Regions:
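N-terminal Rossmann-like NAD(P) cofactor-binding subdomain of oxidoreductases
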Residues: 1-144
Length: 145
């Protein structure tokens, strides 16, 4: 069985930890990279002891070179951060942003609601904000969710 190679950016926050718990129990997922900025070199179990028994990589600083080995990127980062990662996506990469970077389909709306300029305008057309349970066929056509 082919496993999806996954990278989690923002792995040490609450959302990142909960996501890692779910992914580490999924038989079709291989977590290749756990990324963070302030906890480089630490084990994820430092932040949540329930992950001690899981075979997971240590936390590393995100590097765009990782993308060539990754199928799926989850970002559990503050608003604005997934936009930067999206600029470097390869055709095979799918980005699932757990923040608000690609919720709105117009850069002007993003500025209005989030009080910051959208820095990946050209990627908005490649994104969809949808519930998988209601939009599975639509979601398959996009590489930013």
């Amino acid at each position: 069985m082919h496993k999806l190679n996954v990278l989690v950016a923002g792995s040490t926050g609450y959302i990142g930890i909960q996501l890692i718990k779910l992914l580490s129990n999924h038989k079709s997922v291989l977590i290749k990279y756990l990324c963070g900025n302030t906890s480089i070199g630490k084990k994820i179990s430092y932040f949540d002891k329930s992950l001690e028994t899981k075979k997971l990589p240590n936390i590393v600083k995100f590097n765009i070179s990782f993308l060539k080995n990754i199928d799926l990127i989850f970002t559990a980062l503050p608003n604005g951060k997934a936009q930067e990662i999206s600029k470097h996506l390869l055709k095979k990469n799918v980005l699932i942003d757990l923040a608000a970077d690609f919720r709105l389909q117009k850069a002007q709306s993003y500025l209005k609601w989030y009080k910051q300029k959208h820095r990946a305008n050209s990627k908005i057309k490649d994104s969809i904000y949808a519930l998988p349970e209601l939009s599975e066929n639509k979601i398959k056509k996009f590489n930013i969710i």
